Amino acid sequence: MRRRQLRHAPVAVLLLAVISAGGAVGACARYGASLVWPTMPGTFPWTTWAVNTAGCAAIGVLMVLITDVRTVHPLVRPFLGTGVLGGFTTFSTYALDAQRLVDGGRTGLALAYLVLSVLAALGAVWAAAAAMRWFVARTRRVAGRRA
């Protein structure tokens, strides 16, 4: 190993540890949601849909907060964004749920689920980011008037 690579190795290990810890938190939260709100076979997978939509909304809020509002520690984004929210949202379960619907003869529902999930995820991240930007701008205007 080169000297330069050795110098950066502890940072890479720390980054991996932070992402892994966040991923464990997010995955446990998703699993908890599936226990509280189980999906019956052959029905629309509301839990996965809701988790992915909520996770995308949270990603929209997080990105505004850490890019537009304040500078945070460099490990906050990997921990919360890649780790917690990456572990909370789930593309693999999304695909598995769709495949189970197809296998159960519910192809139309599977297609609706696939399309609605993508639309909801993109809409959630966009709407949450826009709402957070509006809220931040409004808060700054109000604070500016008080000063």
Curated annotation (Swiss-Prot):
GO terms for molecular function: fluoride channel activity; metal ion binding. GO terms for cellular component: plasma membrane. It is found in: Cell membrane. The keyword Membrane applies. Na(+) is not transported, but it plays an essential structural role and its presence is essential for fluoride channel function. The chain crosses the membrane at residues 9-29, 46-66, 78-98, 109-129. GO terms for biological process: cellular detoxification of fluoride. It catalyses: fluoride(in) = fluoride(out). It is a multi-pass membrane protein. The keyword Cell membrane applies. Keywords: Cell membrane, Ion channel, Ion transport, Membrane, Metal-binding, Sodium, Transmembrane, Transmembrane helix, Transport. Na(+) binds at residues 86, 89. Belongs to the fluoride channel Fluc/FEX (TC 1.A.43) family. Fluoride-specific ion channel. Important for reducing fluoride concentration in the cell, thus reducing its toxicity. This is Fluoride-specific ion channel FluC 2. It comes from Frankia casuarinae (strain DSM 45818 / CECT 9043 / HFP020203 / CcI3). The gene is fluC2.
